[in-house]
């Protein structure tokens, strides 16, 4: 018999609420794992940084592909990106999520290698992913696989083979290097670093001397995997016209209407994805942080943060 104070009906209501919450949670997990992580998109941005009179120039920014064998949807989408016919492809690392992913990755990126490209590595181009506590990201950036605090021996990836494959395709390695390319009559001076998340960055400065068109107008583009503030400060103070980075996955799991909860580095979470302006010592530089294309195969889930490539259309600076 139910008590007169209605406690039985109260417990029944509470049970229904708990059941609804559990069902909602399960639905969100299924959506994030089965739908959103394969719901690829191209984010388009425009930025006026080219010399006066320059024609529009398109840059396709790829990052955090995290490919594993069998990811056919991702590989098919990567091949289709060639239809964008970019003037330049910039790959900011973390291409792999499996020791056997190099050949499938190079096949998927093959059509894009018909276009000029540059690249830098991320930690997941050196080491295979590990199973980590996802709540650990709220305490700060994940530890390096090389860290002394790690008790597990990291599984090394064939980084040399990956970079050789990119090089065979004509892409330029910017790992702690500087290089000039003349594209559509504009001299692009690139300066790249090895992954700051591994504390491997060494600054090469900007290219010296001349490319094939030494008198061409210069545009300085800095490239890094992880957008740590020290790296953004350095390139901004070194007069970069644009900085491109990845690593954050855009937060990977976001709250609708709020955004990223973590950035996996010291970048403020509101900067975890998108085109923003970085300030340092009175200077400013636009920074594009890609939300990434993949996830670690140990955490195959995205929520309110679709996987993306970024198509940047660079245009001429306005006439003063």
Task: Enumerate the language-model features and the residues they cover.
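Conserved beta-sheet core of the metallophosphoesterase superfamily
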Residues: 227-310, 318
